[in-house]
Structures are given as structure tokens and as C-alpha cells.
Amino acid sequence: MRNMSPNRNFHDPIRVGVIGIGNMGQHHARVLSLLKDAELIGVSDVSIERGRDTASKHRVLFFEDYHDLLPLVDAVCIAVPTRLHYDVGTTCLKAGVHVLIEKPIAATIEEAEFLVKTASDHNRILQVGHIERFNPAFQELSKVLKHETILAIEADRMSPYSQRANDVSVVFDLMIHDIDIILELVASPIVRVSAHGNRVSPESEYLDYVTATIGFENGVIATLTSSKVTHRKKRKITAHCTNSLTESDFLNNEILIYRQTTANWTTDYGQVLYRQDGFIEKVHTSNIEPLHAELEHFVNCVRDTQQPSVGGDQALKTLRLASLIEQTALDGQVWRSCDLDLREIAIAGSY
């Protein structure tokens, strides 16, 4: 499955290139240059100055045209604007190169479907950069919730205004992370979706603030709120369960579990010292950088011929739900399973 020349050994480092050296692409180059099982071959960007600076920093090659990079690598990380994902992604896959592409997988559902098909037709790995899956806080949260009965989940993802990612709405920039997470955690067909949104400026093309409610067949209710204009950065998921309340802070890598117990009194010769109403558990999490874990996983999948934990099929389902949420926020319509087969949009059990 690997795109290897006859003279290369299976145990040689995976040769990787980075296409698109904006903010995220520079981080990809940085991490890849540190991975022991990867060899950063080169970078490509429309900005010659930026591309050459990054290449010089990591002592690799710079390519004005990314097509010239493809014969030299086994895999690429694509961090170009979303509108270019389809063209660049399909070109790389057809060239026999494995692909990690930043989220969202594509600008439209049709383009995403073709990317998934192209990867399958050419027997190439297609991983999508839903980086929160590799956040230590999420990985520990998923372990905790496997032993709980979830009633409702709240996901809050807020950021101050920035010039970054202004070519998409807050749904595709920020909320899409939590959509992917919720689908993974709940693992049940969707039966209802409602959403509302707002813009900083009425003339703005894209929504800056969106809140959505998703009803699942198993009874779980998920409420997602994302903002690009909040004066405080926030990345939190709260799970209301029958036996606990779990709060996870993805920014500070912290998980707290609150449990109510039968009230106990501690006494000293008949004198009440204190009353115990409940207790808080703090879950241990590692300090590994999520991007490091994500790229290491990608390299291992290429080396070992394994499908990634966040492949094209999963990312396509996430994109479908994100598109429906944005549409619902724009027109105010509530979607139910009787109106649209939401079961086909995201059945997390197939993740």
C-alpha cells in the first residue's frame, strides 16, 4: 500500500511533505521534523517567501509547485484553504500518495464523497485532521464515559475574533470539532436537529455564533455552542450522566468528575466535624501535544497499512451534520427524522 520505490526498505522513515505553509502548515512541518519514523522531505506554498523560510528553517526542499513534491514522498499533509482541499487532495491521492488533510474534509459534501472514493479507488490512506480526537483530555473523557449512562452533553467552543479562517462560518471552523467528538461519544442515530446563529455584522457572509441542539435515538441530548467573537477562549465539554457530572477542559487538559453521595457526618465524640455531600475526582491526563499524536498516528497508519481512527468516511458524516446545522441556523427550520433520514447522516456506531 505504501508508495515506495524498489530501493526503499519497509523500515525506512516515511517520507512526508507539507502542502500549504500557513499557520497550521507550519506546525505540521515543525512536528514532522521531530518524528523519529518520519522524514520531512519538503514543503510547498503559494507564498515563495514563506515557503522558503519554512524550508530553510527545517533544512528541507521548497517547491513552488506541489506537483513536483509528489514523486519524492510517501505521504503529504495538506493544510491549504478548505476550497482547495478537493483539487489538491484528489491530485495527491491519484498520484499514489497517502493524505492527511485538515478539517473540514472538503468545502462540499459532493467533493468530500469524491475524495473518499478516490482514496478507496487508489488504495491510499485518507486521514482528516480532527485533532481533538488526539487531545489527551478527550481520550481520557471517552474512557470515563464508557462506564457512564449519558443523559446530555454540552460542548462550548469559544474564541475571540481573529483574521484566521474567515473563509468559513463558525460551524466549519470551530463547531465541527465538537460535532465529531459528540458523534464519537454518543454512538446513536440522530433524530432531531435545531440551530440558531448570528453575525457580528449583518453584511457578513458567514455566521460568527451558532448554538445547535441534537437529539439522538437513545435519548441523549447534545447542545453545541461555538463562537468566533467571544472575548474569552473556551474549549469545554460537560457530560450529565445518571451517576456523575463530568467536566472536561480541553485548553487546560483537565477532567473533573463530580459525584453526589449519601450524606455522611464525621464526628468526634458526638461532635459533628463536617458533612460530606459528594466528592470530586480529578482524572490524570498526559501532556502530549495533540498534533504530535495525530501525525504520529498518520505515519504509523502509512507504515503499517492500517486505516486511521479519523478516516474519510467519518469526516464525511461529520461534514454532513455540520452542513445541516449551518443550513438550520440560517433558515431556522427544525429537522426531524421524519423530514430527513438523519440516521444516514451520522450513525456513530460505525465510527
What feature does the model see in each segment?
Residues 1-58, 182:
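N-terminal Rossmann-like dinucleotide-binding module
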Residues 220-293, 311, 339, 344, ...:
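NAD(P)-dinucleotide binding in Rossmann-like oxidoreductases
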Residues 1-10, 75-77, 124, 297-351:
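C-terminal helix-rich "cap/oligomerization" subdomain common to oxidoreductases
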Residues 106-165:
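A contiguous active-site-proximal alpha/beta segment in oxidoreductase catalytic domains
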Residues 162-221, 226-232, 238:
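Rossmann-like dinucleotide-binding domain that binds NAD(P)(H)
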